């Protein structure tokens, strides 16, 4: 009898949502995703201390300004962790742009190019990297510019259909619609506290995005993210990719059974609608109170963890 993780891999590319190298060795994902929170957690692992020390030493060589050293060391640490992970996976690493730049297109592009250069200088080609950006209008515009320059992007903190549509129209490589955080919001703000997997609002959101992309022939990859339970994952079997935390990878690997494909599209490709304007994007996105709350909340949380990481680095400088 096969286990569910092995079975899931037959219909979906499995990605590890972690910065933990031990988890990569154990579950052997195709790709891996990191974010400021995961980098902060990874930085606490004793085996990573040498990566922190190396990042700090490198930053000292780049500038004598302490503030700049902190920024440089934080960027280099994220890349160092990415480099270690790339030794263990055949595919791509996603590394995130500072969430505090989420409303600044030019600064996001500049930071993305800086991260790419750090990877390139370490011998890693663009084909193995995804730059993560928040799915704000400004982040989507930054991604469109980067894609034209051969830098593929992963648009994260995606909660609304408007965000998904704008990403497809901008030609971004991949989106990460969040499942669990959508469920969290509905549990916290509605009367219903329990949802069957097929009616889970996060699952419904990703399913609708997947269908829309396939119906209209968009090549943007849909990678479901932020899962709260195995039921959500199994309900999205067949999605292009799913990025899954180690605890849920473990649960899947220890469960026997065949996974049934739930998402697929067979049919004619429909004519795409005219491209959204910025005004239309904001109007449609702002019709969704959950998406407004969770996008802002996600940016705040990533920014807080980025600041914690910078403080940790500053204390070591």
UniProtKB/Swiss-Prot annotation:
One of its GO terms (biological process) is pentose-phosphate shunt. The active site is at residue 132. One of its GO terms (molecular function) is transaldolase activity. Keywords: Cytoplasm, Pentose shunt, Schiff base, Transferase. Its EC number is 2.2.1.2. Gene3D superfamilies: Aldolase class I. PROSITE patterns: TRANSALDOLASE_1, TRANSALDOLASE_2. It catalyses: D-sedoheptulose 7-phosphate + D-glyceraldehyde 3-phosphate = D-erythrose 4-phosphate + beta-D-fructose 6-phosphate. Pathway: Carbohydrate degradation; pentose phosphate pathway; D-glyceraldehyde 3-phosphate and beta-D-fructose 6-phosphate from D-ribose 5-phosphate and D-xylulose 5-phosphate (non-oxidative stage): step 2/3. GO terms for cellular component: cytosol. It comes from the Bacteria. Homodimer. Belongs to the transaldolase family. Type 1 subfamily. HAMAP family: Transaldolase_1 (MF_00492). This is Transaldolase 2. The lineage of its organism: Bacteria, Pseudomonadati, Pseudomonadota, Gammaproteobacteria, Enterobacterales. The gene is tal2.
């Amino acid at each position: 009898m096969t286990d569910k993780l092995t079975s899931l891999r037959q219909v979906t590319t499995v990605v590890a949502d972690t910065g933990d190298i031990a988890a990569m060795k154990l579950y052997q994902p195709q790709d891996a995703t990191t974010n400021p929170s995961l980098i902060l957690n990874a930085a606490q692992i004793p085996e990573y201390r040498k990566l922190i020390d190396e990042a700090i030493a490198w930053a000292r060589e780049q500038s004598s300004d302490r503030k700049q050293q902190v920024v440089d060391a934080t960027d280099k640490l994220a890349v160092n962790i990415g480099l270690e992970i790339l030794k263990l996976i055949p595919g791509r690493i996603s590394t995130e742009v500072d969430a505090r730049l989420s409303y600044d297109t030019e600064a996001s592009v500049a930071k993305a190019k800086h991260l790419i250069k750090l990877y390139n200088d370490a011998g890693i080609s663009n084909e193995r990297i995804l730059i993560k950006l928040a799915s704000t209008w400004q982040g989507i515009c930054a991604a469109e510019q980067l894609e034209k320059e051969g830098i593929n992007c992963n648009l994260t903190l995606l909660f609304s259909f408007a965000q998904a549509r704008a990403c497809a129209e901008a030609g971004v490589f991949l989106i990460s619609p969040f499942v669990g955080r959508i469920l969290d919001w509905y549990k916290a703000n509605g009367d219903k506290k329990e949802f069957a997997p097929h009616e889970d609002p996060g699952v419904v959101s990703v399913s609708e995005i997947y269908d829309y992309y396939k119906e209209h022939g968009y090549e943007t990859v849909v990678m479901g993210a932020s899962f709260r339970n195995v039921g959500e994952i199994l309900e999205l079997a067949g999605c292009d990719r799913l990025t899954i935390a180690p605890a849920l990878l473990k649960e899947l690997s220890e469960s026997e059974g065949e996974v049934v494909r739930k998402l697929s599209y067979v049919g004619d490709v429909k004519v795409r609608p005219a491209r959204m304007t910025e005004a239309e994007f904001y109007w449609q996105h702002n019709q969704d109170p959950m998406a407004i709350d969770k996008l802002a909340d996600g940016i705040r949380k990533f920014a807080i963890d980025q600041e914690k990481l910078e403080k940790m680095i500053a204390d070591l400088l």
